[in-house]
């Protein structure tokens, strides 16, 4: 076959179509068949969180388990006096007050995070909320 002279072609400015690598092309064509296994349903990010927020805002029950809270109260009370006894109503009153305080603190913390144009609360938001409340100088 005789050699022929090739003439220069004018460039179109863009990149031409590339050839795929053999391994990449093989990977695309030969996908393993799952055999009809259905994936578990997943909600979009944030949907479950919003559902939980609505659920907990509706409820009035205590969110911290009673026995772990009671152990914590007894452990803290040990530092002041040994062999202190607590009525069950006293522990429940302490738990109600502690949960009310924490809920209020988290509400203020969330406002601090929103003010900083964030949706995620951070420790600095808690510190700011406590400082504004006058609990910590």
UniProtKB/Swiss-Prot annotation:
Entry keywords, A to Z: Acetylation, Chromosome, DNA-binding, Methylation, Nucleosome core, Nucleus, Phosphoprotein
Modified residues (N6-acetyllysine): 10, 15, 19, 24
SUPFAM superfamilies xrefs: Histone-fold (SSF47113)
One of the record's GO molecular function terms: structural constituent of chromatin
Pfam family, one: Histone
Chain positions covered by the region annotation Disordered: 1-36
Modification sites for Phosphoserine: 11
InterPro entries in the record: Histone-fold, Histone_H2A/H2B/H3, Histone_H3/CENP-A
Annotated positions of the N6-methyllysine modification: 5, 10, 19, 24, 28, 38
Entry annotated with the keyword DNA-binding: yes
GO annotation, cellular component aspect: generative cell nucleus; nucleosome; nucleus
Segments of skewed composition (Basic residues): 25-36
Tissues where this protein is expressed: Pollen specific.
Modified sites of kind N6,N6,N6-trimethyllysine: 5, 10, 28, 38
Sites of N6,N6-dimethyllysine modification: 5, 10, 28, 38
Subcellular location per the Swiss-Prot or TrEMBL entry: Nucleus; Chromosome
Known role: Core component of nucleosome. Nucleosomes wrap and compact DNA into chromatin, limiting DNA accessibility to the cellular machineries which require DNA as a template. Histones thereby play a central role in transcription regulation, DNA repair, DNA replication and chromosomal stability. DNA accessibility is regulated via a complex set of post-translational modifications of histones, also called histone code, and nucleosome remodeling.
Subunit structure: The nucleosome is a histone octamer containing two molecules each of H2A, H2B, H3 and H4 assembled in one H3-H4 heterotetramer and two H2A-H2B heterodimers. The octamer wraps approximately 147 bp of DNA.
Protein name: Histone H3-like 2
Record organism: Arabidopsis thaliana (Mouse-ear cress)
Upper lineage: Eukaryota, Viridiplantae, Streptophyta, Embryophyta, Tracheophyta
Name of the coding gene: MGH3
């Amino acid at each position: 076959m005789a050699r022929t002279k090739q003439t220069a072609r004018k460039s179109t400015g863009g990149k031409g179509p590339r050839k795929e690598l053999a391994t990449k092309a093989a990977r695309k064509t030969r996908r393993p068949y799952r055999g009809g296994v259905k994936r578990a349903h997943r909600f979009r990010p944030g949907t479950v969180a919003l559902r939980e927020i609505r659920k907990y805002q509706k409820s009035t029950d205590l969110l911290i388990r009673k026995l772990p809270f009671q152990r914590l109260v007894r452990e803290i009370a040990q530092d002041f006096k040994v062999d202190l006894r607590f009525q069950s109503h006293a522990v429940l009153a302490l738990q109600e007050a502690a949960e009310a305080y924490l809920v209020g603190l988290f509400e203020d913390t969330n406002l601090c995070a929103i003010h900083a144009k964030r949706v995620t609360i951070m420790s600095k938001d808690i510190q700011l909320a406590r400082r504004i409340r006058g609990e910590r100088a």
